[in-house]
Amino acid sequence: MPIDTPYEDLLRLVTERGTPKSDRTGTGTRSLFGHQMRYDLSAGFPLITTKKVHTKSVIYELLWFLRGDSNVRWLQEHGVTIWDEWASETGDLGPIYGVQWRSWPTPSGEHIDQISSALELLKSDPDSRRNIVSAWNVGEIPQMALPPCHAFFQFYVADGKLSCQLYQRSADLFLGVPFNIASYALLTHMMAAQAGLDVGEFIWTGGDCHIYDNHTEQVALQLSREPRPYPELVLAPRDSIFDYTYEDIAIVNYDPHPAIKAPVAV
């Protein structure tokens, strides 16, 4: 059976048809605006196989978001350094993803736990078209070390299956997007487990989809490789989505090609 490769197809599309553009980092990109990828989560866990993805970082970053944390110290304690380039001397990143997900400030001084609210809505009104979690808090963007790239996501239930669609305003296709796909697929599995649902699709929608000019050789190497079957995800049962630990999450039968290193544009 052929392996669906929407990510690799997007890499190829941007390589062939992308527009050369300058960018904030001064690196330069090849860019395409507006694209969608769909993954059937019942058919396997969408962890890219044409290069090895550091799954430990994916899992710990998501758990860090769910903690409502925005300081890299907890990540560093678990050997994860993916946010270090943007952190202050004290490790702080400002009110980024986790803070907005778990503690969105209101004008009255109260805070909204968007993850808990989304989970409650999945249980009480699964057909709601308002089940959205946003990290794009316009009033607090100046305080953030980096404005949210994956800005907001929506849940959708049909036939007892939970799907999630993410909008990513800025998509570093080679380094960032494989992490983002795996992270939100994992979140969808966790939310489905807590709501008593099966998994449906993860849908990724990108705005500025770009390949940095200093990643072109790495992308060419990746596209020369034959995709392999996706792994499976096994979650231990937990009473709350906030109770999951790294040891509760197992990705089995992951057989990727070797990792490919590339510089991060900061």
Swiss-Prot record:
One of its GO terms (molecular function) is thymidylate synthase activity. The keyword Zinc does not apply. GO terms for biological process: dTMP biosynthetic process; dTTP biosynthetic process; methylation. The active site is at residue 149. One of its GO terms (cellular component) is cytosol. (6R)-5,10-methylene-5,6,7,8-tetrahydrofolate binds at residues 54, 172, 265. DUMP binds at residues 24, 129-130, 169-172, 180, 210-212. Its EC number is 2.1.1.45. It catalyses: dUMP + (6R)-5,10-methylene-5,6,7,8-tetrahydrofolate = 7,8-dihydrofolate + dTMP. It is found in: Cytoplasm. The keyword Kinase does not apply. Keywords: Cytoplasm, Methyltransferase, Nucleotide biosynthesis, Transferase. Catalyzes the reductive methylation of 2'-deoxyuridine-5'-monophosphate (dUMP) to 2'-deoxythymidine-5'-monophosphate (dTMP) while utilizing 5,10-methylenetetrahydrofolate (mTHF) as the methyl donor and reductant in the reaction, yielding dihydrofolate (DHF) as a by-product. This enzymatic reaction provides an intracellular de novo source of dTMP, an essential precursor for DNA biosynthesis. Homodimer. Belongs to the thymidylate synthase family. Bacterial-type ThyA subfamily. This is Thymidylate synthase. It comes from Mycolicibacterium smegmatis (strain ATCC 700084 / mc(2)155) (Mycobacterium smegmatis). The lineage of its organism: Bacteria, Bacillati, Actinomycetota, Actinomycetes, Mycobacteriales. The gene is thyA.
